[in-house]
Regions:
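Conserved N-terminal glycine-rich FAD pyrophosphate-binding loop of Rossmann-like flavoproteins
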Residues: 35-67, 71, 255-258
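An anion/pyrophosphate-binding glycine-rich loop and adjacent beta-alpha core
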Residues: 229, 235-340, 344, 407-413
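N-terminal Rossmann-like FAD-binding beta1-loop-alpha1 element of flavoenzymes
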Residues: 7-31
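Conserved redox-cofactor binding core of oxidoreductases
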Residues: 95-193, 198, 205, 249-252, ...
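Short beta-strand to alpha-helix junction loop
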Residues: 74-87, 126-144, 155, 216-224, ...
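Core beta-strand elements of the Rossmann-like FAD/NAD(P) dinucleotide-binding domain
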Residues: 2-5, 191-201, 368-369
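Glycine-rich loop(s) and the adjacent beta-strand/alpha-helix scaffold that form part
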Residues: 201-258, 391-403
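Glycine- and aromatic-enriched mobile tails/lids
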Residues: 1-5, 22, 37, 44-50, ...
Length: 533
């Protein structure tokens, strides 16, 4: 089938749905998402959204914290633009129906009545939150608005396969030179059918790719689809080596991993070794509230010294009532695993969490490809530099999507070429399914072992060789079998894993989330610039 819309939105997190709501004022919108609407990183976001709201805070302080966390690679103009937009757009979320936690629950919700918490790398309390399920509260409000909007049509369980660009069509005279996007080929997972979604403007808001690591804190959908499709279509990727590991993922022997919010440390929880000793004071003046890259490396270093697999996050010094009020979801998840975090410490270890790099773009989401926009974690806007400041991710996604969608587009100028139907292959070789299932696991093992928190050029080169062979196997299967969701995802994971390793090999220094044992120091003279592939 062929569908035609003014706007195609791929992805249904905060960035995708904010953009859909904004552009629905100007035309018809399709939102395509490969799972349910709320199965996204946004819905899993516990901590909150950062903004200089408090009278004791300032834009200047938030800007400086962001720049320092980014290890000198953040773009000051972009940082300033995002941070200065924060309070206004949090008010926008409130107006849409987001129920943030209030200082005084007896009074109406407004900026002045928002309860604010502290997280790593921040010098002020500036994190607006909704208990420990901020992302879920935001998604509930956005989904309700989108479902009621007559100009937004939602296609759940549909995965985008490829962007519709010049390499899919025969060019006619009169088209804009360079690469243009006219939508995407999309697999209807339930009907097992590839459809054409033609669109004058396409927004990719597909999130990150932490699934290329094992363990990670992300939902299973975070397979780097948007980054991979953009790369296949000819867009540039930037700063892919900067993969942030969250310091405190729940650790268990069976690999049952989930995020333990940074806000817990903001409220007073302390990292300890298994013998009960503290250690973060040795690594950074902010101790337990140091930026994430520093805390993750510190934990990794201490665990390697001792041959241990986890440390503890001890919140027993925080009043139990405060813990249960602020962190009900974490409490429930821990209780099902037999842990009472008001009385005993939580076993934690770092896990892959967030991509600071992505598709090279402006803060308005403009990419190398005409009529293709990006917003959120899929993008590299210049905000995060080499390491993201806690709770700046939802802020970036919100600001980018709002800016990209808050002006009329010249829709009439976009002409569709003749787009061929998807080449259908009926054969599906079940006997070779191991190419997909096995290699998906192997990618995670390779990336964790050879391109994780600490890297060496020798192991990165070894990883690249292995990953290129894996990609060739997956792509061969993809080319000769009927398309399936898992095949598309695993292809995308291999593409992004290779991009991470290639970028890491290009940066012969240590900076932010990229630590190279061969070159453990920062080198501003030679490497204070983006890595672009």
């Amino acid at each position: 089938m062929t569908y035609e819309y003014d706007y195609l939105v791929i992805g249904s997190g905060i960035a995708g749905l904010i953009y859909a709501l904004q552009v629905s004022k100007y035309g018809k919108v399709a939102v395509v998402t490969k799972s349910s609407l709320n199965d996204c990183n946004t819905d899993h976001a516990q901590g909150g959204i950062a903004a200089a709201i408090d009278s004791l805070d300032s834009f200047e302080a938030h800007i400086e914290d962001t720049y320092q966390a980014g290890a000198g690679l953040g773009k000051r103009q972009v940082i300033t633009e995002v941070i200065s937009s924060g309070p206004k757009l949090i008010q926008y979320l409130i107006d849409l129906g987001t129920d943030f936690t209030r200082r005084d629950p007896n009074y109406d919700i407004c900026l002045e009545n928002l309860s604010l918490t502290m997280e790593g790398g921040h010098t002020r309390r500036r994190i607006a939150y909704a208990a420990d399920s901020t992302g879920h509260q935001i998604m509930e409000a956005l989904i309700a608005r989108c479902r009621k909007n007559p100009d937004i049509e939602i296609y759940e369980y549909n995965i985008a396969i490829d962007l519709l660009t010049q390499h899919h069509v025969v060019q006619d005279e009169g088209f804009i030179p360079g690469i243009s996007c006219w939508g995407a080929y999309v697999l209807d997972i339930i009907e097992n059918r590839v459809d054409i979604f033609k669109a004058r403007k396409t927004m990719m808001a597909t999130g990150g790719a932490a699934q290329i690591y094992s363990p990670d804190t992300n939902p299973k959908v975070a397979t780097g689809d948007g980054m991979a499709m953009a790369r296949l279509a000819g867009a540039r990727l930037a700063n892919m080596e900067f993969v942030q590991f969250h310091p405190t993922a729940f650790w268990s022997p069976d690999g049952d991993t989930f995020l333990i919010s940074e806000s817990l440390r903001g409220e007073g929880a302390v990292l300890k070794l298994t013998d009960g000793s503290t250690f973060m004071e040795k690594y950074h003046p902010q101790g337990n509230l140091a930026p994430r890259d520093i805390v993750s490396r510190a934990i990794d270093s201490e665990l390697k010294k001792r041959g241990e697999k986890f440390c503890y996050l001890d919140a027993t010094n925080v009043p139990a009532e405060q813990l249960l009020r602020h962190f009900p979801s974490i409490n429930n998840m821990l209780k099902t695993r037999g842990i009472d975090f008001t009385k005993e410490p939580i076993p934690v270890a770092p896990a892959a969490h967030y991509f600071c790099g992505g598709v090279l773009s402006t803060i308005e989401g403009i990419t190398d490809i005409h009529n293709l926009f990006v917003a959120g974690e899929v993008a590299c806007s210049g905000l995060h530099g080499a390491n993201r400041l806690a709770s700046n991710s939802l802020l970036e996604a919100l600001v980018m999507a709002y800016k990209a969608g808050n002006h009329p587009s010249n829709l009439d100028e976009v002409q569709f070429p003749c787009i061929p139907e998807w080449k259908v292959i009926d054969e599906f070789n079940e006997n070779e399914w191991v190419v997909i299932s096995h290699n998906r696991e192997i990618i995670g093992t390779i990336m964790q072992g050879y391109a994780g928190i600490r890297r060496s050029r020798r192991l990165l080169k070894y990883a690249l060789s292995r990953l290129e062979n894996i990609y060739n196997e997956i792509n061969n299967f993809y080319q000769h079998n009927a398309v399936r969701k898992e095949v598309v995802e695993t292809r995308n994971m291999a593409i992004i894993a290779i991009a991470v390793v290639k970028s890491a090999l290009m940066r012969k220094e240590s900076r932010g989330a990229h630590f190279l044992v061969d070159n453990p120091e920062r080198d501003d003279e030679h490497y204070k610039h983006d890595t672009i592939i």
